[in-house]
Amino acid sequence: MPDKLSKWIEENLLNFNYKRKSLDRYKKVLSSLNLKYPEEIILIGGTNGKGSLSELVTELARQSNLSVGTFTSPHLLNFNERIKIDGEEISDDIFLKFLKKIKNLKDSDDLNFYQIISLAALYYFNKLNLNLWVLEIGMGGRLDPMNSLEPDISVITKVALDHQEFLGDTIEDIAAEKAEIARSEKPLIVGSKKVPNAILDKASKINSILISQRNNKKSNFLKNLLKHFSQSKAISEEVLFCLYQISKRSKFKFSNELILKVSENTKLHGRLSLIGNTLIDSAHNEDSIKNLIDYIHLNFKNKKLNLFFSCSEQKDPHKLLKPFEGLIDKIFLGGNIHDRLMPLDKVLLKTSDLNFNFIKMDSIQEIYNSVKISKPNEINLIIGSFYFSGEFFKFLLNDKGLPLSISSLNKLY
């Protein structure tokens, strides 16, 4: 992020607490904005895949000549990525302008960091008179700011264990939190083959139009789409199912041809991103690690794998790395990369009983140098966190003399 925007966020927002709060104060501030809502709002939640789905739906709209505002989190390179218009990041000046507007509103002092950012996005979208808003839930659903709106379509891509300290210890606990984005008489699309009871109960209670793999007969096109991507695992079955169902339930009715085109051509950075012989994937929970290993078995048989790992402070590195036993002998652990990532010594302490040769790497520079000298027939895996993926991408772009932007990432493939 350029200095001006970065400095303002650091001084005015980063000291705001991240604690999950009731939405009462948020809804009061939101109401004061008197927003004019678009023709359609799509609200996308889920443990894994919601960011990918948000990008794909945005691309469907963009290629249909619709104006679309997209709100996602977290970001890889710059804060600006969280707010996009027709797939393009918000400019620094406009972002700062709307952040200041929200910060100066009455009652905004009690809002947390994420609530301020989301209000700035909605206020900006409102000024542009867009056709469609694509809004990603940050975590859970019940207390997410975007749940203050009235979506036309709600989506839960998949429910898996993650953020248990906030959402609960079981799949059903987490599903109950996510189910709160459902609306009466409106479509609730669920990508999981097995729909948790908490979601079934919520949908039944409020009479949502539940659309899932268990209760929806697949069209020939959808069957072929799922089969096509099952060979590579590049996009999960859950995401593809949700994308197809959104396209058919949306008032804009996106074509099958466009679904296929967008699915094949949209670059999902930090999600199985293969650049040369380096795979950058932000897998950061047990479910996404399983998907990554499936992808490795399908695409990198008999290849030597170099695993570079760093995870967020709240994660359990033991659970994330144990599935690689028997597949990888040594793991390069990244340290001093980002202040949200777990210190090296703590990772080692939590993984001491795993059967790996751990090698400490004290900077992103050291990791990048190791990747650069790897042999062409080796595959480097950069995994464990969006923060880790983002820092690696930044170093890669700097090394090639490219600006830190998503459009620059598109040039790397």
Please provide the spans of the model-predicted regions:
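Charged, amphipathic alpha-helical linker segments immediately N-terminal to NTP-binding catalytic cores
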Residues: 1-17
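ATP-dependent carboxylate-amine ligase
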Residues: 1-2, 149-150, 242-245, 287-413
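ATP-dependent carboxylate-amine ligase catalytic core
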Residues: 19, 23, 27-30, 34-39, ...
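Nucleotide phosphate-binding/pyrophosphate-handling subdomain across enzymes
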Residues: 40, 127, 132-135, 145-155, ...
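A conserved segment at the C-terminal end of the G1
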Residues: 42-43, 52-69
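Residue-level signal for inorganic ion chemistry
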Residues: 47, 68, 134, 157, ...
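Short Gly/Thr/Asp-enriched flexible loops that form oxyanion-binding sites at enzyme active sites
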Residues: 57, 139-152, 393-397
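Conserved catalytic-core segment of NTP-binding enzymes
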Residues: 141-143, 150-207
